């Protein structure tokens, strides 16, 4: 039986962890290195860091953060945000990250996925997808530029394309559910989980342990990601894992 993973996410802006609702209204949530250590101790399976101030200045800060985190962590971690070329991947992986996550840059130039997978292996390449329900077409559309720009890609088509090019994992965020704490978008998660043969991480909407359970049972996700409920101590990784075990979910 496959072990399901619980992954805290740290959105990092100018060296601090922040959290918002539907990609807006950002609030400070602490120091990334301190939070990473706490989550490692609490039993997180992995961590995801997203540099949301992915300017040149943001990148320099992020490399420092990655190096500091790598020195303290025993669990794998993924870094994304502003990774536009192979050299960016090299910089982040050399700084100590285990995987890199690509989003906007991959939509603009899908070869980036291929280049990364060929150079580092698929296990290092995570395709992050921000998706939102589109009433007009009755499909989920892919968005770029931090959720600001709608693309023509339908979510499963883009996920399949990314996997074909070598992405080893999909980090799938529901923009409709992000920060709302009302549960993941199971329709979206299941759609993508069934469309691709690689692990799918459900993201956007975690408000409690039951939501995490449903990401696995209803959404068929391989991992569930959460931010604010852990940052603001509304629940702990330990509590989530013991709840999942009660319901027969295989966790570490």
UniProtKB/Swiss-Prot annotation:
Family matches, as SUPFAM superfamilies: Ribulose-phoshate binding barrel (SSF51366)
Protein name per its UniProtKB record: Imidazole glycerol phosphate synthase subunit HisF
Active-site residues, as the UniProt record annotates them: 11, 130
Cell location: Cytoplasm
CDD domains recorded: HisF
GO CC annotation, single: cytoplasm
Entry keyword set: Amino-acid biosynthesis, Cytoplasm, Histidine biosynthesis, Lyase
BP GO annotations: L-histidine biosynthetic process
Species, as recorded: Bacillus subtilis (strain 168)
UniProt xrefs under PANTHER family: IMIDAZOLE GLYCEROL PHOSPHATE SYNTHASE HISHF, IMIDAZOLE GLYCEROL PHOSPHATE SYNTHASE SUBUNIT HISF/H IGP SYNTHASE SUBUNIT HISF/H
Family assignment from sequence similarity: Belongs to the HisA/HisF family.
Family matches, as InterPro entries: Aldolase_TIM (IPR013785), His_biosynth (IPR006062), HisF (IPR004651), IGPS_HisA/HisF (IPR050064), RibuloseP-bd_barrel (IPR011060)
GO function terms (MF aspect): imidazoleglycerol-phosphate synthase activity; lyase activity
Involved pathway(s): Amino-acid biosynthesis; L-histidine biosynthesis; L-histidine from 5-phospho-alpha-D-ribose 1-diphosphate: step 5/9
């Amino acid at each position: 039986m496959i072990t399901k993973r619980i992954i805290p996410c740290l959105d990092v802006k100018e060296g601090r962890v922040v959290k918002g609702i539907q990609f807006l209204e950002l609030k400070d949530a602490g120091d990334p290195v301190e939070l990473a250590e706490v989550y490692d101790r609490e039993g997180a399976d992995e961590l995801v860091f997203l540099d949301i101030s992915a300017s040149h200045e943001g990148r320099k800060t992020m490399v420092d953060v990655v190096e500091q985190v790598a020195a303290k962590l025993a669990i794998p971690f993924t870094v994304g945000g502003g990774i536009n070329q192979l050299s960016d991947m090299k910089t982040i992986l050399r700084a100590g990250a285990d995987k890199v996550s690509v989003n906007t840059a991959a939509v603009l130039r899908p070869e980036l996925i291929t280049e990364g997978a060929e150079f580092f292996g698929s296990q290092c390449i995570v395709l992050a997808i921000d998706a939102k329900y589109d009433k007009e077409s009755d499909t989920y559309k892919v968005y770029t530029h931090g959720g600001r720009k709608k693309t023509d890609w339908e979510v499963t088509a883009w996920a399949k394309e990314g996997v074909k090019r070598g992405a080893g994992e999909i980090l799938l965020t529901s923009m409709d559910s992000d920060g709302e704490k009302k549960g993941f978008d199971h329709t979206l998660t299941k759609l993508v989980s069934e469309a691709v043969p690689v692990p799918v991480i459900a993201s956007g909407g975690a408000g409690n342990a039951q939501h995490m359970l449903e990401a696995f049972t209803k959404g068929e996700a391989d991992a569930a990601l959460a931010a604010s409920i852990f940052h603001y101590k509304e629940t702990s990784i330990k509590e989530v894992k013991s709840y999942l075990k009660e319901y027969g979910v295989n966790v570490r």
